[in-house]
Every structure is written in C-alpha cells, then in structure tokens.
C-alpha cells in the first residue's frame, strides 16, 4: 500500500509548482482553525501570495484581480501537524533494521507523513549521518514530503536501550562521562536540532544510563547551544534529569503522578513535555480488535504485512500472554493523568508519537490517534490540536513561520471535510494537503485509490 502512496505522491509533488512566486490564491468561504486554540472562524476568505498567507478576512465577493479562486465552502482548514517525536528509515514491512535505512525508504516515509497532514517530524536519536544532507535538501524545498528535523545519533547504554533488535545500532553508547562529552562534541559539529538520550531500564530488566553520564551530556550540549531531549519512564528519573538541566521530556512519566514540586520546577526551567500516549495504546490494543482496525484511514498507513501480523491469532495471543501488557495498560492511565496536569500547569506540551520506531507505531495514523488520546486525557479538541501546531512549532523554534494560520505565516495547511473542533476524529477527514501555497496531495485515501 505505502509504496503506491509514495509513488503517486512523488509524481504529484513534482508536478506542482513548488515555488509559487507571486501567484495569488484566494480560498473562498472556508472555516479557519488557526492552531492557536481559539474558536474556528466561519466563512473566511484566505488570500495567499506565493508561499505565504497574505490575509484572513470575512468572506466577500471581492477578490484580487487575476487571483486563482478555490471555493472551499463546507470545508475547514487547519495547520499541518508537527510530530515532535518520530523515527525515519528503520521501519520497512514488519521489520526494524539499520539495513532499511535508505534514502528511498526515508523519502517514502516523508511522503506518507505528508499525506496524513504531518508537515514536519523531529527524529529523536535513531538517524544515521546521511540524514543531515537530506535535512538540508528538505529545508531548501528540493526534498518532497514532511520537513526533517533531527537529533542525529542519540546516546544510549551498552547492552540496553535503545534496543539493537530494532535496528538502533548506530547510537552512541558511552561508558564514561569523558567519552560521552567527546561524542557530544562530534555530534555538535553536525548541528543537530536537539540531542537525544535514553534513561530507562525497561521495567527493571536493563542497565540504566548513569546520572554522571547524562549530566555530562546535558552540560556539554548546552555549551554548544543544543537542547537535550530524554526518553524517560519513571518519575524519579524525570526529577533528576530536570535537576540536571534537561530541556525536553520526550515521553510521558508513567509510573506515578507528577507531583507539584516537579511541575513547578519544569515550569520554572521551561522544560517541554512530549507525551507519546499512542505508544502505550498500541502496546496492548491489538490483543483484541481495536475500533480503528478496519478503518481505511488506518490501513492505508500500514507497511506491507503489518495488518496480517496484528490480526493473526498468534500475535494476539503473544500480546495477551506478555507480562508487560497489563503494565502498559496501567502506564497509559497514569500518562493520561499526567498530560492533563502538565497542560493545566502551563508547561509547553508538544505532540509526539514515537511513530516509525516499531511496525505497530504507524506513521501518519499515530499522529491522529495521539490527538484523540489527548482529548481522552481531558483537553478540548482545540487544545489538543494546538499541541501539534502552535506548541510543536514553538518546540522546534520555527513558530515564526509555521504552526498557526495567520498573515505572514507559511501557507501550509490541511483541508478537512469536517470541523475537528466539534469532534477530534474529524482531523481524519483529509481532502487535501497544501504546502507553500500549493496543493501537494488529496489525502491518503484518494492518493491510494489513484495509485491502484
């Protein structure tokens, strides 16, 4: 399925004029969800010049002379989503391997993300050095699909996380603080967007990164003007990491409720939080048949063979018998409580999914599932969407151009058949994706139908 999507999208992207220049386009009679969290503005005319939004005004009969007019009556537009925790290249079919890490595979995954309305992905720690050239092409506009942001090679632990069995054999695994600092300096020369570390013992089964090593990485990163994001599970690890200067908690705290002192310290230090709720949902959901299993929107995102894998009796039984399955169910419940506490405390909450790190963490679909889970946690649909638009752009430090729909911002948005402010599932009603003032695809379902 996905190879067909990638091929069709690639043709469409290159068929479109990627540099619209002075072309003026008016989107008529459209509802605008601007990504800031405020209410949807009905019956608007959005004027675009080149790749930027020129104005958003109440609909009228007057349009600029020579403008291209696109009637979007009955539609809603919203900013493209930004995934602030994803992975590229390692996944192919039902396998995770560094052998899968090729330019063709990365390109196909970027196009898949874009078809699902994901305009950018921050890859946290599992990239090879080739990613920096692709990132440069992405920023120049010569690489179609979602924009690349990357931590390059992350920092893990020898014989521990991240797992070698998932193709994550390229990361640094320092044994001493001095080694960690030296490797950080090597990484800094490549100018990653952030630095990624793993601090977790996988339910007490593996060695965990030593505090002196992660403290050294954080200090050295800050010396080079780089922020650090950490894989985390336990409350006490989060507390120690924040005390050591961590900038981004890249997963939910899932063993205990985040207490007021840590919330206050996070807010004081401006620590961001990426909950990746869908990660835990997917860990146990397929022991039965989840409600989304037969959804074309879900199935179109799957790598070949994954649907057969997750619907097999063997796989279901494997999940049911896994002693960690019950722990994952409990972990998600704790995560849901914590994400609401983080949001209510005014801490920067940024949508991320860990999609692409396993075959069941589906690129494109996961980002919409994450929004659904954020609403389940107690956020309104508009608040949930803001974590994936305004907030995620702020985390990437690109909110001067991306993340919201406003005059002067990039004309990058999703066209929806239904208003997601009334039902978060409506983010899945994608009829088109626009980038730099031009339509680049018609959503995953239409693209798949054309490819077939």
Give the positions of each predicted feature:
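Acidic, glycine-enriched loop/beta-strand segments at the rims
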Residues: 32-45, 57-59, 333, 362, ...
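Short, acidic/polar
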Residues: 102-110, 173-187, 232-239
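Alpha-helix-loop-beta-strand connector modules within alpha/beta enzyme cores
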Residues: 140-154, 208-230, 270, 274-275
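Active-site gating/metal-coordination segments in enzymes
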Residues: 162-219, 248
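Histidine-rich, glycine-flanked metal-binding segment
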Residues: 32, 36-78
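Divalent metal-dependent hydrolysis catalytic cores, especially in the metallo-beta-lactamase
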Residues: 108-131, 145-153, 192-203, 227, ...
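Metal-associated gating/positioning segment near the N- to mid-region
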Residues: 76-140, 158-165, 212, 236-248
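Active-site neighborhoods of metal-dependent hydrolases
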Residues: 182-205, 253-377, 451-452
